[in-house]
């Protein structure tokens, strides 16, 4: 692992958070991931709309009380006025706030790391994309976190290097099973089960954002049309909790996705399969250290992380450990933070960098997921008719 850019820059990035209090699982994941490589220092935050949770989280994070805010607008204003103000902010709020918070901090000259989904609607996403494009000096990353796994990046490189021949089929599923019943107290439900946060099709903002981004990341293909069927299988639920998609790609390439919150017995479920003319790739998030490369006419290969001589540069760059030591979710998430930080350093130092290695999901990737989301919603409303993207 190289620390040359960090050493050249001479200090950690001053980092802040909006959302992600102690009552948030993903907030702690962001903090763990950012700390892994010594590139970020948490110096400020509007960590919760609940003042008690915000204060408690700030205390646990050892923040100066003067830099613990209960309003992200006040945080953006005051931090932008400080010589030692935050340089990067992570947005870990529900999606209906992502666009507003992102644009505010970007307008103050602060780079943004945004949780998925990018926004609540496609209209907001396109507007945010335009807003970012008008500020070319700003960095913007969407945390499509599973793209940080070493073997996911290895799969991407293998596809691009022609190991599968011509890609013919792309399949990506996320059938999780922990949400078989609905909370009777509506106010205690997660945003994914409250349509006011992201519509009745919020399953696409949660697990769908991962499958859509993963399919494009690995295959390099962007769908041109989608057919979708969605269902509510849980009594009392207001949002769809199961969805099936068919996708068409340029050149006759086919795709399929299954999203679910009610796949009973599944702890997680994220997996992809890419089939080409010469072979195929299979990967599962619950077994992240195994990538199966299947060939036509000869035995399959089981690829594992930790072998610099057996992996592409892209796959090896994402490895943290030598062979035999499991790589995990937080390490994969941390790869996004590391790549973002090194991109930040390189830009500040006027240095070039290899974008194949420093791969961060951009606002354009976030917009892509929202385009598929909106097309799928329209298709479902039209009884599964094909909708062009």
What kind of region is each of these model predictions?
Residues 45, 89, 170:
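Receiver (REC) domain switch-region micro-motif
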Residues 205-290:
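Glycine-rich, aromatic-lined ligand/substrate-binding cores of catalytic
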Residues 67-86:
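A structured beta-alpha segment of the ubiquitous adenosine-cofactor-binding alpha/beta core
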Residues 6-10, 138, 165-169, 378-389:
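C-terminal capping/lid region of NAD(P)-dependent oxidoreductase domains
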Residues 138, 146-237, 291, 383:
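Predominantly a Rossmann-like dinucleotide-binding segment in NAD(P)-dependent oxidoreductases
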Residues 1-6, 244, 249, 278-360:
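C-terminal glycine/acidic-rich active-site capping loop/insertion
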Residues 1-63:
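N-terminal Rossmann-like dinucleotide-binding module
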Residues 88, 94-147, 162:
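Beta-strand-loop-alpha-helix segment that lines the small-molecule cofactor/substrate pocket
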């Amino acid at each position: 692992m190289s620390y040359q850019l960090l050493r050249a820059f001479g200090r950690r990035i001053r980092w802040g958070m909006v959302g992600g209090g102690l009552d948030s699982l993903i907030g702690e994941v962001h903090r763990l991931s950012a700390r892994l490589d010594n590139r970020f220092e948490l110096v400020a935050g509007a960590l919760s709309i609940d003042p008690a949770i915000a204060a408690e989280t700030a205390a646990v994070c050892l923040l100066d009380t003067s830099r613990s805010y209960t309003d992200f607008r006040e945080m953006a204003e005051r931090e932008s006025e400080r010589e030692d103000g935050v340089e990067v902010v992570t947005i870990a709020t529900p999606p209906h706030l992502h666009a507003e918070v992102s644009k505010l901090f970007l307008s103050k000259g602060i780079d943004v790391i945004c949780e998925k989904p990018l926004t609540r609607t496609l209209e907001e996403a396109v507007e945010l994309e335009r807003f970012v494009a008008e500020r070319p000096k700003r960095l913007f990353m969407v945390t499509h976190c599973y793209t940080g796994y070493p073997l996911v990046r290895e799969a991407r490189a293998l596809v691009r290097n022609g190991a599968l021949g011509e890609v013919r089929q792309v399949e990506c599923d996320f059938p999780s099973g922990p949400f078989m019943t609905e909370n009777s107290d509506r106010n205690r439900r997660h945003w994914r089960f409250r349509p006011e946060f992201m519509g009745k099709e919020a399953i696409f903002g949660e697990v769908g954002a991962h499958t859509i981004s993963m399919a494009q990341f690995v295959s390099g293909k962007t769908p041109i049309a989608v057919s979708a069927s969605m269902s509510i299988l849980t009594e009392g639920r207001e949002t769809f909790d199961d969805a099936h998609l068919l996708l068409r790609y340029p050149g006759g390439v086919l795709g399929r996705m299954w999203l679910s919150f009610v796949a009973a017995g599944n702890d997680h479920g994220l997996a992809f399969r890419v089939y080409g003319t010469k072979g195929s790739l299979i990967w599962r998030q619950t077994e992240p250290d195994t990538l199966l490369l299947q060939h036509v006419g000869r035995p399959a290969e089981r690829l594992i992380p930790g072998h610099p001589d057996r992996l592409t540069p892209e796959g090896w760059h994402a490895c943290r450990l030598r062979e035999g030591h499991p790589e995990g979710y937080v390490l994969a998430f941390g790869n996004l933070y590391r790549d973002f930080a090194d991109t930040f350093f390189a830009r500040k130092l006027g240095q070039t960098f290899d974008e194949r290695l420093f791969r961060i999901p951009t606002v354009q990737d976030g917009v892509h997921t929202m385009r598929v989301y909106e097309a799928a919603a329209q298709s479902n409303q039209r009884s599964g008719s094909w909708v062009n993207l």
